Amino acid sequence: RIAATGSCRGQVLKYVAVGLDHRATNASSMVVMHLINLLMKTHRQVFAFTRPATARVFEKMGFTEVAKAEPLYTLLEFGFRSIRDYLDDLKSRKAPAAVKPAGAVVVNCNPFTLGHQYLIETAAAQCGVVYLFVVEEDRSVFPFADRWKLVEEGTRHLPNVVLLKGGPYVVS
């Protein structure tokens, strides 16, 4: 019989499960720590999604809650960087409070099209500042570096657009 199992995709732990007969043991921490050790060789952070009722198990292993959607999901993270670091970086890019209104757009731009450009130009015309988040995850046909360069070139003429990397937290 299998005592415990777990897997990962990218930097996300998935399908961590422990058999009923082994829940009073350290089986979950053995599986999770093994996966963390593997992932930390190539990533600076590890994420886990779980039910809020089981989030405490991950917190006892050093994970920190990022967000919760009761009663379905809790997102937790572990590693050398955290959402606080990401938020600090965003704050450093914030426009002065006098610049209003502020808008935000999240794009993947796989690839950057005239439709994307129109959307961003329209937002820029209606807002004092537009924060343009480009999804950083590399699951697209075009790699992030290429998409970033296309968005940079396509918005260079818009002085009130602040280009931001989505990091591991922004999805579209």
Regions found by a protein language model. Give the residues of each.
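Conserved beta-strand in the GNAT
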Residues: R1-A17
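Short glycine/proline-enriched coil/turn segments at helix->beta-strand junctions
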Residues: C8-V12, K41-R44, A125-V129, H157-P159
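A generic "binding-loop/recognition-motif" signal
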Residues: V12, A53-T54
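Glycine-/proline-rich flexible loop or hinge segments
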Residues: L13-A17, L38, V135-E136
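Conserved glycine-rich acetyl-CoA-binding loop
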Residues: Y15, G19-M30, R56
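Conserved acetyl-CoA-binding loop-helix of GNAT-fold acetyltransferases
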Residues: A24-N37, K60, H116-E121
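Conserved GNAT acetyl-CoA-binding A-motif
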Residues: N37-A53
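Nucleotidyltransferase catalytic core that binds NTPs
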Residues: T50, F58-F63, K68-S172
